[in-house]
């Protein structure tokens, strides 16, 4: 199975190209979850501005995002983002340090923003700090994920909108593999899936989408062993939704390919079974023609 990268390769290449070339850049491109990037060079080419917009920006920034971005990007982080975007970084062309490390850091902008609530909760549990009872991140127009600290554990609940009933079925089959793995490996997160009805941990929480046919709730319980590896755990859990949908699409593609191959083989069998047409003209071994009735 594929593990998705947490950095944006296009953004990485744009930053590297800015330092290697003498050209103006003004590119807009997308990432998973409706994320939009805008990369543009200043008029005098003295700096490169990188902006990002995403649906969950407000929730993420108030739940650890602002503090994390400030600690990672320092003076590059602008107090007032570009119009129409949620976060803006400005990279000076005169930067003389390791440009590849800088490009990698900038390419992780979305990762740091989305990982912030997880890291905030992990740190709070480790330091025994008071934490909100539940944190809701509306990361898409019709989807939310929730973080619920519970003693030394964290429950992460994804409210996922599926395209149709077929996707719901495929997701159940796919998620069963996580359950099966837990039977042989003891330190993997506990996982449950429920359709329509939200888990009990969301009882009384406002805005929960209950009773919708093509919605499902995937719950992970992260244990102390996972919390002690905050960066790795944040990387894996924040890409889960995209990871799930990617493999649903792969499963559909595999089934469609298998069906096409099966149809082609059946057509070949039928073609071989066709009777030869009557009144055909054939050639003998000596080259003469004769008509067969």
UniProtKB/Swiss-Prot annotation:
Lineage, uppermost ranks: Eukaryota, Amoebozoa, Evosea, Eumycetozoa, Dictyostelia
Gene Ontology BP, a term: phagocytosis
Gene name of the record: arcB
Main function: Functions as a component of the Arp2/3 complex which is involved in regulation of actin polymerization and together with an activating nucleation-promoting factor (NPF) mediates the formation of branched actin networks. Seems to contact the pointed end of the daughter actin filament. The Arp2/3 complex is involved in organizing the actin system in cell motility and chemotaxis, in phagocytosis and macropinocytosis, at late steps of endosome processing, and in mitosis.
Presence of keyword Cytoplasm: yes
PANTHER family: ACTIN-RELATED PROTEIN 2_3 COMPLEX SUBUNIT 2 (PTHR12058:SF0), ARP2/3 COMPLEX 34 KDA SUBUNIT (PTHR12058)
Family per similarity comment: Belongs to the ARPC2 family.
Top-level taxon of origin: Eukaryota
Name the UniProt record assigns to this protein: Actin-related protein 2/3 complex subunit 2
Any one GO cellular component localisation term in the record: cell cortex
Quaternary assembly: Component of the Arp2/3 complex composed of arpB/Arp2, arpC/Arp3, arcA/p41-arc, arcB/p34-arc, arcC/p21-arc, arcD/p20-arc and arcE/p16-arc. Interacts with carmil (via the region between the LRR domain and COOH-terminal proline-rich domain); carmil is required for Arp2/3-dependent actin nucleation. Arp2/3 complex, MyoB, MyoC, and the alpha and beta subunits of capping protein all form a larger complex with carmil.
GO molecular function, one term: structural constituent of cytoskeleton
Name of one Pfam family that matches: P34-Arc
Keyword tags: Actin-binding, Cell projection, Cytoplasm, Cytoskeleton
Annotated compartments: Cytoplasm, Cytoskeleton; Cell projection; Cytoplasm, Cytosol; Cytoplasm, Cell cortex
């Amino acid at each position: 199975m594929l593990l998705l990268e947490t950095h944006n390769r296009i953004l990485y290449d744009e930053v590297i190209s800015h330092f290697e070339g003498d050209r103006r850049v003004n590119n807009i491109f997308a990432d998973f979850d409706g994320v939009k990037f805008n990369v543009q060079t200043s008029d005098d080419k003295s700096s490169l501005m990188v902006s990002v917009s995403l649906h969950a920006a407000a929730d993420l920034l108030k739940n650890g995002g602002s503090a994390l971005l400030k600690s990672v990007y320092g003076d590059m982080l602008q107090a007032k983002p570009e119009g129409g975007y949620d976060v803006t970084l400005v990279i000076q062309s005169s930067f003389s340090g390791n440009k590849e490390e800088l490009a990698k850091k900038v390419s992780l902008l979305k990762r740091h923003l989305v990982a912030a609530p997880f890291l905030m909760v992990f740190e709070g549990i480790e330091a025994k700090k008071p934490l909100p009872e539940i944190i809701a991140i509306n990361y898409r127009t019709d989807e939310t994920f929730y973080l619920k600290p519970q003693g030394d554990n964290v429950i992460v609940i994804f409210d996922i909108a599926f395209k149709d009933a077929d996707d719901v079925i495929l997701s159940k089959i796919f998620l069963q593999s996580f359950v099966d793995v837990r039977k042989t490996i003891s330190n993997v997160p506990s996982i449950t899936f429920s359709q329509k009805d939200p888990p009990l941990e969301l009882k009384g929480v406002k805005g929960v989408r209950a009773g919708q046919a093509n919605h499902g709730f995937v719950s992970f319980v992260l244990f102390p062993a996972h919390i002690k590896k905050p960066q790795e755990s944040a990387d894996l859990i924040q890409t889960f939704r995209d990871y799930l949908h990617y493999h649903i699409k792969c499963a559909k593609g595999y089934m469609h390919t298998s069906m096409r191959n099966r149809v082609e083989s059946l057509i070949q069998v039928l073609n071989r079974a066709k009777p030869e047409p009557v009144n055909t003209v054939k050639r003998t071994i000596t080259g003469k023609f004769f008509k067969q009735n």
